[in-house]
Structures are given as C-alpha cells and as structure tokens.
From Swiss-Prot:
Classification lineage: Bacteria, Pseudomonadati, Pseudomonadota, Gammaproteobacteria, Enterobacterales
Organism, scientific name: Escherichia coli (strain K12)
Biological processes per GO annotation: viral process
Pfam families hit by this protein: DUF2303 (PF10065)
Alphabetized InterPro entries for the sequence: DUF2303 (IPR019276)
Identification of the protein by name: Uncharacterized protein YfdQ
Designated gene of the protein: yfdQ
Length: 274
C-alpha cells in the first residue's frame, strides 16, 4: 500500500515540476494560458476573466448593406473580403492580419444572398411538365410579374394568356394516299397532331423580378412548349439561364467591390480557408 502511495506521490511531484517548466515557457511568450498537471493540457483562462482577451465572432446575414457596414466598421489592417460570385456568397475576414503580424482569422462576416419569392417561383416552374390547369394557375398567381407574347411578338396580358392555356384542345387529322400500278399498289397513312385554343395562344413569356435581395430587377425570357398527346403537357423554360446567372454573379461582385471602395477592406474573387 505504501509503495503505491509513494509511486502516486512521485508522479504528482513530477507533474507539478513539469507543469511549472511549461508555465515558465508560456509566460515568456506572453500567452494568456496556463499548464496544469492534467496530462500537461493547456487551459485557457479567458472564461474566468471579466472581459474577453480579444474580439472575435461570426456574423451571418442576407443583407448587403448590413454586411458591408459591419465589415467596414470592424475592419483593421489586413482585412480581406473574399467574393464567391457563383454561389452569391462573400466572407470578410476581419482579423486576418498581415504577413508580419498574422491574425487568428476567426472574426468573420458572411453574406449569403437570399432568393426572392418571385425568383424562387420562376425556378420552380422552369423545365417542369405541367398540365393546363397547373400552368394556368401558376401564371395567374404570378401575373404581376408576367407578360405573354403571341407568334407575332405582340404582348398578351398574363390573365388572358392563362385563359388561352385553359382552352387548349388537341386536334388529330389523318391523311391517306393511294398509288395504283399495273402490278402493285401502295398506301401511306399520315397523322398530324396540333394544339389549338379559342383565344390568342402565347408562345413566350417575360418574367420580370428582383432575383436576389439587393440586386436590380431584371427580365427573364421564357419559351412555352406543348407536348401533344391525349392531354396536352406544357413546359416553360428560361432562355439562356446560364448566361443570366453569370450576369447576376458579375453584378453581385461589382456591387461589393464598389461598396468597399476607399475602405480598409480589400476584395478578392474566390474563397479562403485559414
């Protein structure tokens, strides 16, 4: 028993002496920490202090104005903003520091633009197969943002375009051709299917809205396709969606670069990991 106590005491004395040596090293580098004899684990004393030793935190917002104002107010030497335009996202690292005096890079502000309700509705219908009823109802729901166009390019009110879609009928016509020769005969049968409506039929639409909060309003051109069958299936598709998304990304990037102009925040295109 005494041998066990002696061994335990020796281990504790060894741990205390080792911790003292570690603390002497910590005090020389000016770190706010202490080593305790618990497998020589370093314990941060900040939580026992009245105030934090340094400011740090992580802001997350969908507001461009709040993001830029917060970033500029807390910006210090070496503050950087990294713009991920493809994902409509940006991160300001407020304590990145410099090469000579690097910071901890744990005080950040993150901006993630939010899609507006009209733009989300537009993306939800893009390329989807709709019945007459469902597409007509969608057009009526978002009529304030829509205008239709006929085959001649003339504008049609959204409500009238919805009414025309509700009245689409499918007509099938058969044509038989016969050919007689002295020694043979040939017959061909052709069927044509056509979608018609009693009203003026829209062939395209324009949907105008603000796609993301903080960006400008822009028009989106849509093409209407009809798949004929027993019942018509209607598909709305955004024309050159990728090109429009690229334009929005460029607008987002240019907007942030302009807002941080003449401030301590330097902007970069891309992402950053500390």
């Amino acid at each position: 028993m005494s041998q066990n106590l002696d061994a335990t005491a020796i281990n504790q004395i060894h741990a205390l002496i080792s911790a003292q040596g570690v603390n002497e090293i910590i005090s020389k580098i000016g770190a706010d920490a202490v080593a305790l004899p618990e497998n020589f684990r370093i314990h941060d004393l900040e939580k026992f202090n009245l105030n934090r030793f340094r400011f740090r935190g992580a802001l997350s917002t969908a507001s461009i104005d709040d993001f830029t104002r917060y970033s500029k107010d807390l910006a210090d030497e070496g503050t950087r903003c990294f713009i991920d335009a493809d994902n409509m996202r940006a991160v300001s690292v407020l304590n990145l520091g410099t090469i000579d005096e690097p910071g901890h890079a744990d005080n950040t502000a993150t901006l993630k633009l939010k899609k507006t309700a009209p733009f989300s509705a537009l993306l939800s219908v893009n390329g989807e197969r709709n019945s007459q009823k469902s597409l007509a109802e969608w057009i009526e729901d978002w009529a304030d943002y829509l205008v239709g166009f006929d085959a001649n390019g003339d504008a049609i009110q959204a409500t009238k375009a919805a009414a025309a879609i509700r009245k689409i009928t499918i007509e099938a016509n058969q044509t038989a051709d016969f050919e007689d020769n002295d020694f043979s005969g040939k017959r061909s049968l052709m069927e044509s299917v056509e979608a018609k409506t009693k009203d003026i039929m829209p062939v395209a639409f324009e949907f105008k809205c603000v796609p993301f909060e903080g960006l400008k309003e822009r028009p989106f051109k849509l093409r209407l396709s009809i798949i004929t069958g027993d019942r018509p299936v209607l598909v709305l598709r955004i024309i050159q969606l990728e090109a429009v998304q690229e334009d929005m990304a460029n607008e987002f990037r240019d907007l942030l670069v302009e807002k941080f102009k003449d401030s301590k925040v330097e902007t970069f295109i891309g992402t950053f990991t500390a």
